[in-house]
Amino acid sequence: MSGIFGKMAGGIMRETKTKSGFKVHAIAGTYVVLFGFDLPRADCNGLLGFSLHRVDHTENESYYLEANKFFAGTNPGLKPGEQHSTKDHPIQSFQWADYTAKPGHKYTYTITAQKGAPGTLVPHAEVAIDIETESPEGGNHDVYFNRGVAGSQAYVRRFGDRAPDDVENNQAFVWLSRGLYEAMEEFVSSTTRGRHALRIAAYEFHYAPFLKLLQETKARGVDIEIVYDARKKEPGKKNDDAVRAARLSGACTKRTEGSYISHNKFIVKLENGRPVSVWTGGTNFSEGGIFGHSNVAHVVEDNEIAA
């Protein structure tokens, strides 16, 4: 995995550093950086959380990231769900995601494990880590992490208690996708008749707008073949219904045999009969997979990997 997820397009998109027993693991996508923190159990006594400071070398900015949990005793008047600096109210979790990252930016994150007491924090251990987000315009790899937080306070702050379908102009779906679905659309839409073909293997295959896009692409003359899971009622029936509604049955093969689920989620793009790129990752071709669950998509422009 290190060969794929290490250095890409001249930058580092995955990095792990350890100092004084404090380990930080960071993985960058195109619009997000994911973090995992590890501190020896013996050092966790009195731990209050983690402060995250970010230097944006691309835009020459420097600041602490914000979060929405705070210490009641030192709350300056914030209401539940409001944002505050992690300098004073550190993150109370061993994993975090910076969804304010921008494509093609170079960042230095300094993560500090804080002890002491609310209002008088004492740094216990600190790790600085350099990372670069992917740029869709260059390189052989693009990685997309959706937000996948339909039930989170961040969603409620922006859209209230409304379901994504009830938010005007699809803005809730755009926010939840964080570029993932748009990249999926582009992967399919960039095909041309007589030059490209698509080979799709799917487990959940029932997001109607995506199937509609595939039908339109097929109607343009692009060769498309699809195999999807139909071993059991779920997701088999949803898949069958969606395929019929999209008029894609002629391009599909139903996987009905086997003792295991066909948990596939990839698209191979062929150019002049040869595999040239692949869309893969953990994202099902369903509304829940694309917008609801926390998921990742990885586009690899490499003939050998695509094959």
Describe the role of every protein-language-model region.
Residues 111, 123-196, 201-307:
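HKD-type phospholipase D/PLD-like phosphodiesterase module
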Residues 3-136:
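Low-complexity, Ser/Thr/Pro-rich intrinsically disordered linker/stalk segments at domain junctions
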